Amino acid sequence: MTTMAETQTWQTVLGEEKQEPYFQEILDFVKKERKAGKIIYPPQKDIFNALKLTPYEAVKVVILGQDPYHGPNQAHGLAFSVRPGVPAPPSLQNIFKELHADLGVSIPSHGFLEKWAKQGVLLLNAALTVEAGKPQSHANIGWHRFTDKVIESLNDHPEVIVFLLWGSYAQKKSQLITNLRHRILKAPHPSPLSAARGFLGCRHFSKANQLLHEMGRGEIDWALD
């Protein structure tokens, strides 16, 4: 017997949204900016990597970010992740510190989080593009409407999902998660400005696995090396 989760895909839950005029306007805006010579991150082929690498039916954990990295060779479509060979930015370093303190896994030698994505960890930024060197430059071009729709579609997911909401921006999205089946864990943002105020010590990685285990969903192997 197939469950509803197995029959639903990103295409079935987001297909209509992608037909909305605003969505095409976002894509046209990004295309024009690139044509005008502006550097936009991530590269075009990577914009929807979070959805490509973590199928709807496979989502177990959601980690929300705000904006892609705006430096060269960093952003590749997964929140907090950087390409292989690129040093882990400060927030990601703090994520790894907490991972080590929580689970005892070694601090990874890289910041490439694709292994998490392929296990069902949706690494979703609220805005999916950014202009080089200009944080939040694409925050108001319509991406938030689309990524809110992604979160709303996950709220309807028939399986338990654990949402890790780090920082006040991500925590505001909890109002979209109304289904009591899901679990929400909140902590300050892992950035150096706030990590010591409660992100370090939050133990979200072990707590997420405990919740997944209790619901029979299978734990995440958070180790990256």
Curated annotation (Swiss-Prot):
Q: How is this protein named in the record?
A: Uracil-DNA glycosylase
Active site residues according to the UniProt entry: D67 (proton acceptor)
Q: What organism is recorded for this protein?
A: Coxiella burnetii (strain Dugway 5J108-111)
Q: Does the keyword Hydrolase apply?
A: yes
HAMAP family xref list: UDG (MF_00148)
According to its record, what are the GO cellular component terms?
cytoplasm
Assigned EC number: 3.2.2.27
A single GO molecular-function term is: uracil DNA N-glycosylase activity
